[in-house]
Amino acid sequence: MRTRIKEFRAKFNMTQEELAKRVGVRRETIVFLEKGKYNPSLKLAYKIARVFNAKIEDIFIFDEEELWEKR
């Protein structure tokens, strides 16, 4: 899953640390989210979207092909 977290942080002039504190996670979690190495829980995705006054789907871009991809 791709994210636009970094883009939204820049728009709001917010550091990874500030966002992490606002949503109750460690900065490393934000790093992993931005790199696409971690998929957030629905609750975390919602919290992040609320910080930026946006919809979840504005921040998290889900590739539907990933859903059907065999692992």
Swiss-Prot record:
SMART domains: HTH_XRE. PANTHER family: TRACRIPTIONAL REGULATORY PROTEIN-RELATED-RELATED (PTHR46558), TRANSCRIPTIONAL REGULATOR (PTHR46558:SF7). It comes from the Archaea. It comes from Archaeoglobus fulgidus (strain ATCC 49558 / DSM 4304 / JCM 9628 / NBRC 100126 / VC-16). Keywords: DNA-binding, Transcription, Transcription regulation. SUPFAM superfamilies: lambda repressor-like DNA-binding domains (SSF47413). This is Uncharacterized HTH-type transcriptional regulator AF_1627. GO terms for molecular function: DNA binding. InterPro entries: Cro/C1-type_HTH, Lambda_DNA-bd_dom_sf. The keyword Transcription regulation applies. Residues 16-35 bind DNA.
